């Protein structure tokens, strides 16, 4: 959640459509982006809604010619809205086309690039390369790859150096499971790669920002334990690549994950610290404004222009400008101005969850803080406690549908954590920030001891509140999220409380919202075809029958929280809340946690594993959840129900393909990795089968002779007509 400067009591005196054109421009840019997105993912409902809005505004434009001047202002606002719907649509469309232009094919290249980012995790290392050179031609996008640390000379793998290697590249799909892969697009990562052969390293130089960040890293690593140093680095500059997974899970489970992303909370604290110091030095307001603006711009650069940091910085600078010139501080207009700047420069940020949570949280605080605070004061609750609770509740209520859409759960301990832990965290942030600045010049290790101990207290309290668990919450789609926010806005004082029938209209909107959410959470019905879909990770597919039975085949290739989240998102996107069976042909102990979590979350009835699974693993899985666990030799046919059978094809003790028999019609699904021995097996044994495979395999395996009926991109659906 976020804190913002105090809300002026005059913010809600007038109607929004009369006095806040910036808000209408911001809404127009959002609707324009969604309009473009809806056509790309074929969201017919959203298209219809936006067409209706466009039609209404067009009618208003015509009518405005014949209306009196008093009413004309309303229609001029609508005209402004439609203009920026068009602007937002054009900018988003341009960004989509720009990112979706892949100049390189998915094959092997000799690639040279500058190391931009390095993340080490036990035995593996993940590297992001920039300033890419392929065949003596420069490209302005980045490439990301992971490999074993033993494959590289770690002394040379530092930010600023360059490397040259043979790599197998694969383009990043902008849309996965109906959602934009905004985290990669924000970092301009167009390709992921697999390292084939390392060729050479080159010594390079760091930028000024990189040198500063490296200096901060060294100070933190010298004075704090490893996990706390990377946590501190994350909350100072927003770089989470080396943050330990269990530490992130702790903050997430207790409802404090928002403090790990540099946001309005952190920017606000920095502004408070520096402005306080500058005022003590008796600097005049214009000089404070200039110096603070310069510092915040530098901070945005250090944080790689994170949307939440840019938003908070723009709002802070705007408030300082208003204070400097004695102007009224209008929270909604300042908030909208920040959003306009970001969407004009980076249109795809609209689809980034960090942008959504940051702006919606602040929107909720602007709308709901005052009425909730007044309610707490009515019960004689202390001002500081009432203020903290009001901010937390306002942001939580507003972001509820976005949290539901992306995570499907809400931490029970959120309120307690934000009331008790957040003030302690805020105090520790002050100490950490000041000690890090002093550490650039002096040895202040004794101050870092305080930071270390306060972190220990935070971890202990977080562990207690995380034990409260979480509750599952309903799924929301884009339409229902928009409706939810409109209802919130309409119910507040920003819409004239004297408006006739306001309560009746609000109740009607709530009723429509409830019905829409219910429809959104209704399992899709497939009456004719069998639906086969793959997630945006390797070796994981879902099969939905015409009787709406769901079978999850495979749970990924690496295990870990990322794959679990991607699988859960895939199932939620398809409105699948119950899975009849999880089938894993190549079981490994690293899949154990994900299988257990998926089984609990999606009420899995059966888990079917390959025959070489140990009894110890079976007992472990049975202990974690209530599903029945079976083993099967997948070289023999397994009957799932009356219509569907499955069997696997094995080479070198590993299944690389499996056969689905649906109503006596056979389909063979191939794994993404096709070695030459597997290709030979296909040519000899499966050439008369109907195959479903990844499109990349078709491109790279021209020597396969088979009857290909479907080519899979990530997140594609296939209707098996039988």
Predicted regions and their residues:
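N-terminal leader/targeting segments
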Residues: 1-101, 494-501, 601, 607, ...
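Hydrophobic alpha-helical segments
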Residues: 1-38, 322, 383, 420, ...
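Membrane-interface helix/helix-cap signal primarily in integral membrane proteins
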Residues: 2-15, 82-258, 565-572, 578, ...
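Non-globular, low-confidence helical/coil segments that flank catalytic cores
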Residues: 2-3, 43-44, 109, 123, ...
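Residue-level signal for inorganic ion chemistry
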Residues: 32, 113, 167, 354, ...
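Alpha-helical transmembrane segments of polytopic membrane proteins
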Residues: 46-57, 357-358, 418-423, 477-482
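Hydrophobic alpha-helical transmembrane segments in multi-pass membrane proteins
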Residues: 71, 246-415, 475-525, 707
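Membrane-interface helix-loop junctions at the exits of transmembrane helices
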Residues: 299-303, 370, 374, 395-412, ...
